[in-house]
Amino acid sequence: DLAAYLKQNGKPAELRRPSVDAFKIDDETPGVEVVVENTEACPRYSGVTIKGVTVKESPEWLQNRLRVIGLRPINNVVDITNFILHELGQPLHSFDAGKIKGNKVIVKAAEAGTKFVTLDGVERTLTDRDLMICNVEEPMCIGGVFGGLDSGVTEETTDVFLESACFHPTWIRKTARRFGLNTDASFRFERGLDPNNTMYVLKRAALLIQELAGGKITGAVQDVYPAVAEPYTVEVTYEKINTLIGKDIPVETVKSILASLEMEIVSETAEGLTLHVPVYRIDVQRDVDVIAVSYTHLRAHE
């Protein structure tokens, strides 16, 4: 949105994302396997195993970047997941792969009444509407909300399983409210994330872990994505745009602004446009949503 605003004001800016071209599998030995049983609550789950890491204090530059946004450095692996959460907006979770029983991650709803101790040492009673990240024997993490006490990365960890997933906002919101857990991860998942971004973020994190903690990316990347998200189709009329903005906006200006917001015009008539809205714009699914996200740019042309 900022890049679009700058472009409309004669100051074009390009968003540059860190390259992940160096990502590769170093060892074909099988890593942790992933099974998603509840694809409604978890539309996409990506993960990768990194073996032979050295968990230690993060370098000063990483610690400083976390401190300036109010986060306490923990160790290099956890700090990387926290850093990338704020860099790219996608929550990550790191597990000690040695503690994943059966070498398998299973994403499923909890059995009602199951007891689970979270990272803060509190025992919680789960419901069948709480999505859990489990191994073959027990839950390890409340998906998208809070980690478990016994499955996280410590200084003794040598093998890491890195999770980059997309969880359904309603599931996350209800679980977070039920347990009073308002975390950085739940805050973002509740508002909806782009499922098409999980693999890029996973690769970015894995490369940074290799850079700061060593290790080899082991086995195939796990990526369960049964129903690929497609762009939203939205129809919007010039009359409605002008009515809600309170001023007649030139047609070419409207088109230019929508293009700068990465909304593709797939067809048009004298009355309006049919758009493909990017998947990452979770909150733009109606014509009024299109006008709302365009409002600042449209008002600038008064």
Feature annotation, model-predicted:
Residues D1-R299:
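RNA/tRNA-interacting regions in translation and RNA-turnover enzymes
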